[in-house]
A protein has these predicted regions:
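Generic recognition of cysteine residues
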Residues: 123, 146, 168-169, 193, ...
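Metal-dependent polysaccharide deacetylase catalytic core of the NodB/CE4 family, i.e.
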Residues: 153, 168-173
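Short coil-to-beta-strand
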Residues: 157-165
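Basic/polar, cationic surfaces and motifs that engage anionic cell-wall
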Residues: 19, 25, 46-74, 172-243
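N-terminal catalytic cores of peptidoglycan-degrading enzymes
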Residues: 2-156
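Solvent-exposed, acidic/flexible segments
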Residues: 93, 128, 159, 174-182
């Protein structure tokens, strides 16, 4: 009888041990399932988040500049006087990108901003006075070229040595361009991309070089910047289909 009671106790202990073991297994399995579901969810979110970028990159990679011919927009050449502050005359030998800026001078036109660059020639040879741009686009969409494309401009910091710079006028502090300014910018950038076979990903904002809020509207509204680059791609593809 004592032996039977001992056997019963042993069985109960074994049963409790098995229950605890089963409970641990179930807990581990539950945690593993939850982790797996979380990983799958994160994967789906990541794919959804980056797929537009992949699509955009694919569109860019499809461009064949040998089949594209973008006509030169109407440009008024009003080159700056050579000087140490705004037109040093340093050769720009390898053009790999285009940098978009805004003037940060609301309501002014292309001529006024060009003349501001010109006025730097009378300033001391100091860093604070070194400023210019290859092109300025006015509120009315007119384009003034201040510096030849084969010379550097003092506009984009460390990217001065390999990029073309474009300053855009804007009517107010928001930095948003007028429709005419925007259309001229799309045309000019498309023309430069075609001429120098520049990838769309190398059409950048001043912000992308220095983190400066320039061009303000495109920095504050990155979706508008993406749309702008898409408009360039669309413009180039349209010209490709016309050839």
């Amino acid at each position: 009888m004592f032996r039977k009671q001992a056997d019963d106790k042993t069985m109960k202990k074994l049963t409790r041990a098995k229950k605890r073991q089963l409970k641990r297994v179930l807990i581990i399995a539950g945690v593993a399932s939850a982790v797996s579901l979380l990983v799958i969810l994160i994967f789906i979110l990541v794919i959804r988040g980056i797929s537009p970028k992949f699509t955009e990159q694919a569109k860019e990679d499809e461009l064949d500049y040998t089949l594209i011919k973008v006509g030169k927009p109407l440009i008024s050449e009003k080159f700056l006087t050579k000087n140490v502050n705004s037109r040093p005359g340093t050769p720009l030998e390898n053009i790999t990108g285009v940098v978009v800026h805004y003037t940060a001078n609301p309501g002014t036109d292309a001529k006024a901003n060009r003349n501001y660059f010109e006025s730097r020639k009378d300033c001391p040879d100091e860093g604070q006075y070194k400023v210019s741009s290859h092109f300025v686009i006015g509120l009315d969409g007119s384009i003034i070229q201040c510096i030849p494309e084969n010379e550097i401009a003092y506009a984009s910091n460390k990217r001065n040595s390999d990029t073309i710079s474009i300053e855009c006028c804007h009517p107010d502090d928001s930095g948003r361009f007028t429709e005419k300014t925007y259309h001229s910018l799309v045309h000019l950038v498309s023309y430069l991309c075609d001429k120098y076979e520049i990838p769309i990903k190398q059409v950048i904002r001043h912000y992308d070089v220095t983190q400066k809020e320039c061009p303000r509207y495109f920095v504050k509204h990155p979706e508008s910047w993406r749309k702008f680059r898409e408009d360039i791609t669309t413009y180039l593809k349209k010209k490709e289909s016309e050839e």
